[in-house]
Each structure stands twice: as structure tokens, then as C-alpha cells.
Amino acid sequence: MTTVSDFTAHQTATAVVARKGTAGPRPSAVDAPATLTDEHGDVYVEPGLTPLAAREANRSALVGLLDAAGVGHFAVRGTVDHGTVVGVAEEDRERALQAVFRGLGQYPGHLSVVDPDAPRPAKPVSSRDPRAWREVVGARILQVSWYRTDPGRHLLLGHEYGCALEFWRRQGTCLVAPRANRATWAVAVGGPNVMGAARLFSRFVSDWTPGHLAPALPTRPEFLVNCADDIAFPVDAVYTWVDGNDPAWKQRKAQAKGEVYHAESASDARFISRDELRYSIRSLHLFAPWIRNIYVVTDDQVPAWMREDLPGARIATHREIFRNPEDLPTFNSHSIESQLHHIEGLAEHFLYFNDDMFMGRPVAPHSFFTPNGTARYFPSRNRIPQGAVAETDSPVDAACKNNRALLHERFGKVITQPMEHIPYALRRSAMAEAELEFPEAWARTSASRFRAMTDLSPTSSFALYYAALTGRAQPGSMPFTYIQLAVPDLADRLQRLLDGRDQDSFCLNDAFSTPEDTEAQQELLDDFFTSYFPTPSPYER
């Protein structure tokens, strides 16, 4: 019978050997361990790091140790999306623990004993510390992880991305779980392992997530059920983007005819490219790997850094999506947004991003859609100004007032709030239906080459409220931050956002900026973007 003192002595000895470079199965293909601080302990440097990659590397490392020891195991549908869960029979406890000790001896990591009944989780402890092993022998659940960072030491992905080892107790013909999961309390003793789709084991994963980041896992048949809270439908992402420095685009803009009623409507600040799109797509790669396809809508422009030869992201030009070619060229985002539902191949459920919107941490599709497909919208605390459209209204307020008047005429309801600058969850069918139901207003918006007094705001308000009033959308909420780049304390706000990393999404919105302002802002943004989103997406050259 193995004792706590045996485990402690074993771990201390192997940790010393590991410091000398003993060969053995590594937790993943990473560089040599690098300690960020004494508090963090061993941290492994991994190029191309993402939360999903860290999650899979920890799972793969742990099950590799179990496989090497001949310990049978199965993936469990846990209730936490960041990490993974592996179940083993209680009778295999000693062999499983010895395998874990050997692995952590060769490549030190972190572990914690999980008590499902505790009011708060135990803090992870370095496997080099003998205290980490004191309660392991009788533990019902053990969480194991290897901390990871990117080569620039900007990301630190820790214990929450680890793999939990659950010991399932035999009771009659069943193995019984030590805690609740998403599917079942028990599986059959000696039951077969079957392959389960990766999305069953985390809501951060979809059927379109790359297999090397989220492979199918050996599990039990009891976990293959389609739960009521599963989202299996595809979700796409759509961006509108312009390179305001493109000479050809500048010439088209100079030749465009149309009445510009407000100085802000055609200001250069609206068309400045600060490379936000590159980093916004990085945010999807890092924090929303469940997105199926990314569409970038442009006026025959392609970002210089973007690859077009890979599936999963493509350019959709204005010429492809506009139903009335005479509306082109256009320099009005409202006009372009009115045609997004015409993108060929676009999913019924999609998120519309301005290129200044970003995911801030891992987010599940459930934040934007319910499992039955209902979209979520995010009303602002602000209010739409009273009265009819006036010449003094900003383009945003004028469009909100037009939305309000049209929806009130149709539904007898008065909308009072604009939307927060959070990615807009849209239903393609609702937009198509709105275009058919309000053809004159829709066509008028499409034909406005610059923002006009008569515009609707199709994606950021009108289509969301139309979906809500027809039973296809409901209010939601999420932690988010909105930063106006013109604020005097921009540097401090960006630093707080970077230090906290506690927002589901954020928006860095531009104002009417002078060239001097823009230059200073760009320097701050360059540092911020490379620190917050250090890992390139696959779509970068």
C-alpha cells in the first residue's frame, strides 16, 4: 500500500533529477521551462499558444501518462469549459497516481485536490513542493496542469486549463462519478469506449474547431447525448473593413457624389486603419475558436497581412453582396451593413464586428445565442434622444431615431436604448425579412454613399430590435469595456484592460482625431495589441 510519505519522497527525488534534465515524456512540445516569478513556479514557453492549445496539451500529457501505465480512462463532460476531465476506475487509483507522480517528476507542474463540496477551490501548488502531495492519496478528484506562456511572456495560462483526474467508484454494475457533470452520474462497469465529438467536452469548441486543437476524445456512450444546452449550429463572424490609405480607394471616395450633412460623417478618422482587424481576428483565434467562417467585407481591398489561401476566412467584396450595383461605390457603413445578409454561404447565426471590437477572454457562443438559436442583444444604459430627426443630431442619433419611428409604426412599440459596442449577434433570416418588409427605408439606406439623415442603422440596432419584436432575439449582458481613443488617460485605461483581462469583449472606438492625436494613439495601440494578442492567427502571412 502506497502512503503519503512514499509519494512525498518520490516527488522530491524525481524533481531533483528533473532539474538535471532527465529525458521523459514532455507535457507538450515546448521550450525549456522558464519561471516568470517564484509565485507561478515552472512555466513552459510555447510558440503559437492559445487557451485551447494549453487545454489540449494538458489533457494530452495526462492521458499519455495514463496510457503509458496501462490505466484505462474516458473523457467526462465536465461543467467547466476551460479545462478537461478524465475518469478512471477507483480500482486503478494507485497506478494512475504513480503515473502522475512520474510525469510531474520529469516535468514539474501544478496540482490541487478538488473537493466538490468545498465553498471555494483549493489553490494549485507546485509539484516540486511536498505539501502538494499530502492529501492526494484519498482525493476523489485531482487537477493537474503545466503552466504555459508565449515567447514574449504576455499570456499566462495556468491551472484553469488543466486536466482533472476523477476516480469513479464501483457500485454494482456501474462506476459512479465523484461529482456532477453535464450528462450522467454513472457509466457501466467494463463498458466500451467510443469516440465523442470535441464540442461535447467544452462550449469553447464547435464542430468547426481545428482538430489539432480539439480532437475527438475516447469517452463512454452515456456522454454522447445531445443536451438541451448544447449549441450545435454554426456561427460565423463578419467584419467590414477599409484601408483609408489606399490611393485607389481615396480616388473613388473623391469622385463619389453625395451630400455630406455632418462633418463626422466623412471624416478621415472613420476610415483610418490601425491594424485593428488583424488583432480582432487574433482575438477570435484565441478566445472564440468555435467560429466557423470569418468574412471580411471590403471595397475590393485585401489587408496586406491576410492570407486568402486557407479555409475559414475570405474576402467578400461590395460588388458581391450589393443587390443594386448602382449603390456603389459607398463609403457609408450603414449602407454596407444593410447588405451583409447577402454574403454567399453565410450562416443563419452570425456575429457582426466593427474592426475595433475584440474578444477579451474565452467566450462561449452561449454568450451571444441561446441553444434554441435566439440571438442576444446588449442594450446600452444611454437613451435615444426624444423627438424627430434634427439637423443637429449626430449620424448615430439620427439613425436611431429613424429606427424608432419605423419600428413603432410597424409594431406599436417604442425603442428607447441604443446598443452597446459589443459584437452584434444577428439572424440572417431576420435581416432578409426586414429588407422585404421595409423595402423603401432599406433601399434608401443602401443608396446613401455617405451617412445621411435618412439612414437606418441595420446591424447595430434595427435588425436586433426587429428580431426581438418577432421573437428571435432577447436582451443579454456580458462584462465589456468601451474606450474612446480620444480620452486623455488612454494609456492608463489600456494598461488596466491588459492587466485585468477580465472582460468578455471590448471596443476601442475612434473619435474625430487630429493627425497628432492619431500618431500618439497608434504608438500606444501597437504595444497594447501585441501584448494582449501575441499569438498570430492562421490567416496571417
Curated annotation (Swiss-Prot):
Q: Name one GO biological process term.
A: polysaccharide biosynthetic process
- Which InterPro entries does the UniProt record give? Stealth, Stealth_CR1, Stealth_CR2, Stealth_CR3, Stealth_CR4
Q: What class of enzyme is it?
A: transferase
| Keywords for this protein | Exopolysaccharide synthesis, Transferase
Write one Pfam family the protein is assigned to: Stealth_CR1
The record's GO molecular-function terms, alphabetically, read: transferase activity, transferring phosphorus-containing groups
Q: Which family does it belong to?
A: Belongs to the stealth family.
| Name of this protein | Exopolysaccharide phosphotransferase SCO6021
